[in-house]
Amino acid sequence: MTSTADVFDKKDQFNFVFPFTAIVGQEEMKISLLLNVVDPKIGGVMIMGDRGTGKTTTIRALVDILPDILVVKDDPYNSHPHDVDLMSSEVQALVLNRMNIETCYTKVPLVDLPLGATEDRVCGSIDIEKALSEGKKSFEPGLLAKANRGLLYVDEINLLDDHLVDVLLDCSASGWNLVEREGISVKHPSKFVLIGSGNPEEGELRPQLLDRFGLHAEIKTVKDPELRVKIVEERTEFDKDPVAYIRKFSKSQDELREKIINAQNLLPKVEMPRELKFNISKICGILDIDGLRGDIVTNRASKAYAAIQQRNVVEIGDIQKVIVSCLRHRLRKDPLEIIESGEKIQKAFTNIF
């Protein structure tokens, strides 16, 4: 496992990243990201907020606190050497034939999806001419292949083509990418945490797409002058000497990484009392939330938060910490309503609990 102190020994690390534990404020965004890392089944996170509030900085910082993953060496899909659901068909064939597989540890991939990306760039492309002339499937993996077992980040996702957003959400939910062209199909694992960010002034996602994101974090510009000055000072110190600044936070970074590993291991043992499950569903009913995604995600996020706190039983406080992010984007829009969505959810929570 890579520790923060090791990064200075690697040549590819000289593009320094601001430490996650040094980021001031924006707790809702940080917690939403950590919950998805502990339990990727939560279904990703949509981060909406003003420009210059640290959305991209925080997402890039997340990778440095994640434990390294074991992969098959030189495999374009980051295949797991033992888990069949995370293997490409080529690696599966090697395993079935009991061939030796060379493995190595690598950092969790963070793949950026540019707004102008074509479907072939995202999903991968099949060389039809080669397939017809030589009878071989020639597949060029896309961004979804690179993102397997990692994070896929789309900045300004609200401006991305709806069809591509649909493709990303389908892959994120199923863990597989299926490419079909002219009767030829290729399937490969693509299990990732989808992270979208955007500015609400530039438009929202369609409600049907928004509902499929597990969590929704709202980021606002810090108003407190003390905090604003602190943020400016921290950034100035980092820019002046990034090596010294990263070393300063190496202990807290390593501690958080250890906390994530422990939470991932504890998660399968975390239980939620039936009474709390019932109350979550009651809140979703009172708020008139369509479908059951809200119930499911709130249950999962509450368990993940309890695991981060190193507890194997969910408490009321765990639910309160995550419920706004789980339900905010699932509320029906009422243009005449004055109360903010977060306040409405907290009010319903207080009435039930």
UniProtKB/Swiss-Prot annotation:
Family: Belongs to the Mg-chelatase subunits D/I family.
Residues annotated for ATP binding in this entry: G49, D50, R51, G52, T53, G54, K55, T56
One GO biological process term: chlorophyll biosynthetic process
EC number: 6.6.1.1
UniProt keyword annotations, A-Z: ATP-binding, Chlorophyll biosynthesis, Chloroplast, Ligase, Nucleotide-binding, Photosynthesis, Plastid
Cellular location(s): Plastid, Chloroplast
Catalytic activity: protoporphyrin IX + Mg(2+) + ATP + H2O = Mg-protoporphyrin IX + ADP + phosphate + 3 H(+)
InterPro entries the UniProt entry points to: AAA+_ATPase, CHLI-like, ChlI/MoxR_AAA_lid, Mg_chelatase_ATPase-isu, Mg_chelatse_chII-like_cat_dom, P-loop_NTPase
Pathway: Porphyrin-containing compound metabolism; chlorophyll biosynthesis
The organism of origin for this protein: Cyanidium caldarium
Domain of life (superkingdom): Eukaryota
Gene expressing this chain: chlI
SUPFAM superfamilies: P-loop containing nucleoside triphosphate hydrolases
Function (record text): Involved in chlorophyll biosynthesis; introduces a magnesium ion into protoporphyrin IX to yield Mg-protoporphyrin IX.
Gene Ontology molecular-function annotations: ATP binding; ATP hydrolysis activity; magnesium chelatase activity
GO cellular component, one term: chloroplast
Main EC class the enzyme belongs to: ligase
Protein name in the entry: Magnesium-chelatase subunit ChlI
Gene3D superfamilies listed in its UniProt record: Magnesium chelatase subunit I, C-Terminal domain, P-loop containing nucleotide triphosphate hydrolases
